[in-house]
Amino acid sequence: MSTSSSALSQLKNSPLAGNINYEPTVWSRADALKVNENDPTTTQPLVSADFPVMSDTVFIWDTMPLRELDGTVVSVNGWSVILTLTADRHPDDPQYLDANGRYDIKRDWEDRHGRARMCYWYSRTGKDWIFGGRVMAEGVSPTTREWAGTPILLNDKGDIDLYYTCVTPGAAIAKVRGRIVTSDQGVELKDFTQVKKLFEADGTYYQTEAQNSSWNFRDPSPFIDPNDGKLYMVFEGNVAGERGSHTVGAAELGPVPPGHEDVGGARFQVGCIGLAVAKDLSGEEWEILPPLVTAVGVNDQTERPHYIFQDGKYYLFTISHKFTYAEGLEGPDGVYGFVGEHLFGPYRPMNASGLVLGNPPEQPFQTYSHCVMPNGLVTSFIDSVPTDGEDYRIGGTEAPTVRIVLKGDRSFVQEEYDYGYIPAMKDVQLS
C-alpha cells in the first residue's frame, strides 16, 4: 500500500483536542526548487576559523535555552540557563589517536551522537557560559542516548519539565521533572530522577522503526496555543508507511517547471513535522495528531521544530540538512520555516521556498541546529569551518548568534552578535 500526504487528511474526533479537520500542509518540490543558497537575506554570515571554544573537555551541539510555554526565554534569579547535547572529548583515548599518535578530533566528533548526554550551563551575561554538569545522573534515562528536546520553567518555585528524546533502543518522546536552585555563586539543576515516556511513533501517522530502520522520531517542543489555551507539542517525524512505499503525487510535486517531473528516488524522503495534544496543562497524558507539515519527496528530516507567535501569525521553524534533500533538489543546512494564521494551518513556506537561514555555500557545514527565539535571535552550534586547502576545524561549541526579522511571509538576516549570546527575555525571581 502506498502512502501520500493526502492520505493523512481526514476528519478526526480527538478525545483530547475535540473535533478537528485539517490537511497537513505539503512542502512541495516546486516550493523547494525556489531555494536560493546565494540570497544574502537568508544566508548566515561566515564563521571565522579562529572561533573560541567554550570547553576543551566536552563537545556541545543542540542548544536548548530554558523557556516558558509561550516561548519566552527566561533567566532565574538573574542566571541564564541553557541545556546542550554534550559528549566528552577524548584527546588521550587510544581509540581516537591516528597512526602517528595524534588526536583524531574529526572521528571523535563524528562518534558523538552515540554518547550524547543532556548537560546544562549557566551565565550572568547571556554568554560566558559556565558548565554545570549532567541534568540526569547516569542510569536515570531508560535508553543509552539522551537526544534533544525542550526545558520548560513551570513556575516561580523553580520546577522544570524537561521534554526530550529517549533513543536506543527505539525512540520515545519523554519527560522528566526537576528543579533549579540558584545562589550567588551559580546554578544547580536537581532531582531529575523520574523519567516518564509519553509516546512513540504509531505507524498510522508517523513511521515506526519496523516500517523503516532509519526512521526519525524526536525533538519534542511543547507550547500553549495562544488562541485555544491548550498544551500542544511539535516534534520531528516521518510520514507513516513502509520505506519506499510512499507516492510523490501531484500535491507533493506542486507546479514544477518543465523538465522537473521525474522525481527519481524521491519517494524515500518522507519527513514531517508532527503534532500532539495534552489532556491538560500538566503534560502527563498526550494524544498523537496528524502532521502539520509533510515533506514527502522533498526532504527526510525536519528536526527540532518550534514556534514563534508574532503579529497574529504562527511561525513554525525547523532545521534540515543538505544531504537529506530528495533527488533533484538541493538546499543548505539551516533553518526552514512555514507561516499561517491558525495552528492547524494551512501554512505557507516562508520566502516562497521555506528557506529562512542557510549556511553560506563556501562554508556549507559551518553551523547547525538553529533555535529561533521570540526576540528574533537565532542560536546554533559550530560544526566545521574550512581552514587550509581541504582541511577544516571542528567546532563542538556555540556559534555567533544572529538576528532575523520576520515580516509577514518573509524573513531577513539583520545582525550578528557574539558567540553563544543567548540573553533572557525575562527574569523570574523564585519565591
Swiss-Prot record:
* Temperature dependency: Highly thermostable. At pH 5.0, sucrose hydrolase activity progressively increases with temperature until 55 degrees Celsius and then falls quickly. At ph 7.0, the sucrose hydrolase activity increases rapidly passing from 4 to 15 degrees Celsius and remains constant up to 55 degrees Celsius.
Q: Please name the GO terms of the biological process aspect recorded for this protein, alphabetically.
A: carbohydrate utilization
* Induction entry: Highly expressed at the end of the exponential phase of growth.
Q: Which Pfam families match?
A: Glyco_hydro_68 (PF02435)
EC number(s) stated in the UniProt entry for this protein? 2.4.1.10
The relationship between pH and activity is given as: For sucrose hydrolase activity, shows the maximal activity in the 5-7 pH range, while the activity decreases at pH values lower that 5 and higher than 8. Levan polymerization occurs mainly at pH 5.0.
Per its UniProt entry, which superkingdom is the organism in? Bacteria
Q: Where is this site: Transition state stabilizer?
A: 219
Catalysed reactions listed for this entry: [6)-beta-D-fructofuranosyl-(2->](n) alpha-D-glucopyranoside + sucrose = [6)-beta-D-fructofuranosyl-(2->](n+1) alpha-D-glucopyranoside + D-glucose
Enzyme class, broadest EC rank: transferase
Mechanisms controlling activity: Sucrose hydrolase activity is negatively affected by salt concentration. The levan polymerization rate is constant regardless of sucrose concentration.
The catalytic residues are: 62 (nucleophile), 303 (proton donor/acceptor)
Keywords attached to this Swiss-Prot or TrEMBL record, sorted alphabetically, are:
Carbohydrate metabolism, Glycosyltransferase, Transferase
Q: Where does sucrose bind?
A: 61-62, 148, 218-219
Chain's role: Catalyzes the synthesis of levan, a fructose polymer, by transferring the fructosyl moiety from sucrose to a growing acceptor molecule. Also displays sucrose hydrolase activity.
Q: Other remarks?
A: Strain KL103 contains two functional levansucrases, Lscbeta and Lscgamma. A third copy, lscalpha, is non-coding because of a premature stop codon. Lscbeta and Lscgamma show different sucrose splitting and polymerization properties, and differential expression, suggesting two distinct roles in the physiology of the bacterium.
Q: What is this protein called?
A: Levansucrase Lscbeta
Q: Which species is this record about?
A: Pseudomonas syringae pv. actinidiae
Gene (name only): lscbeta
